[in-house]
């Protein structure tokens, strides 16, 4: 299955590694302050995880007979069982990153607004049970993102 790697050893560590690498990458740019570095790290991680877990439907492997063609990776995790340890971890990571980025942005209103909006509407809301199998189409932005 497409999402079995989420439960394997080391899958949780990769999120910390990706966040650390993003932070180091944004620190390399001259003129980027610590506030913007953390905000850009948060934005990149949140948008990347949205694309990976919620935008693309299906599976790259063809030995499942099309059973997962209409499911996102988030819906494929743990056979659609809600509130498993992996799902809880994937909900907590963006929230923790939001808190860290807000702290290092010295609670600046502009940075807080960016971080809060993205974390809430791009990272947390799509993972809630109320949005399970809910498809929202935004013309020009969300098209047919399906692996076939």
Curated annotation (Swiss-Prot):
A single cellular component GO annotation: endoplasmic reticulum membrane
Segments crossing the lipid bilayer: 12-32, 36-56, 89-109, 111-131
InterPro entries per UniProt: ORMDL (IPR007203)
Domain of life of the source: Eukaryota
Membrane topology of this protein: Multi-pass membrane protein
Similarity remark: To yeast YLR350W C-terminus.
Name of the protein in question: Protein ORM1
């Amino acid at each position: 299955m497409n999402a079995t790697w989420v439960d394997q050893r080391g899958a949780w560590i990769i999120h910390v590694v990706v966040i650390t690498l993003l932070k180091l990458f944004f620190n390399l740019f001259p003129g980027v302050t610590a506030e913007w570095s953390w905000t850009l790290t948060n934005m990149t991680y949140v948008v990347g995880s949205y694309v990976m877990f919620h935008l693309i439907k299906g599976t790259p492997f063809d030995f499942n007979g099309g059973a997962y063609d209409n499911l996102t990776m988030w819906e494929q995790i743990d056979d659609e069982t809600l509130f498993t340890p992996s799902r809880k971890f994937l909900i907590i990571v963006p929230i923790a990153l939001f808190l860290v980025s807000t702290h290092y942005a010295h609670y600046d209103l502009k940075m807080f607004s960016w971080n809060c909006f993205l974390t809430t509407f791009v990272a947390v809301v799509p993972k809630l049970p109320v949005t399970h199998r809910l498809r929202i189409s935004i013309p020009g932005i969300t098209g047919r993102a399906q692996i076939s």
